[in-house]
């Protein structure tokens, strides 16, 4: 969710969302907030507060419930072994999550975000995915409609809707492409990780500043190194099928203040958001 408190001039912006501190930044038009609404966000009406000299702005924001759908995926034995390795998955998650939570104060990008690879998505954001062995495809499978998978490649699942089936929410979108196709940075940023992980395979993470990090999974090759500065349109890797992938494609994710959000919202962000310019007099978040 994008929010702007217009014409609010304060050297030390302070904002809260659901009674918890929320990073916010000065722009030439006011105070800008980008609030993560991951797929597992509770529905309801919540309070957004922006402190300002002489008082505060308080707004009630309603978050609607949404059904993201479910998907059953049948894997070869070797791929299923990856999905059923909670200890290794949790280890990788600890390493990756600390990077995804980076909150660098400078916004590095400008203009509309681009698509990292051309084409239509094959699986959308937030879909609940359940993983089975290929041999299970001939038997009847029952899902508990009241239970929900928790986590996004981030460790043990709880309340598993189907006993024995590893399950996660899809924390990004899948973009089918031929093996070796170029993957570009959708916006300017700095590469903060190039790694190899059990589920995401060859992975590149790019920090775009002010809590926004983009992720590229299952790469055949990475064409950048940690610390590289990239511009919008620069190549960061090539499409592959490393990690937990049944064929060549790019898993593309966007994380906001450490939480996954729908990448499509960043591609389709409103024009007023694109036009925001950081206040050069204040680049430090308070």
Where are the language model's segments positioned?
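Non-catalytic extracellular/periplasmic "stalk"
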Residues: 1-160
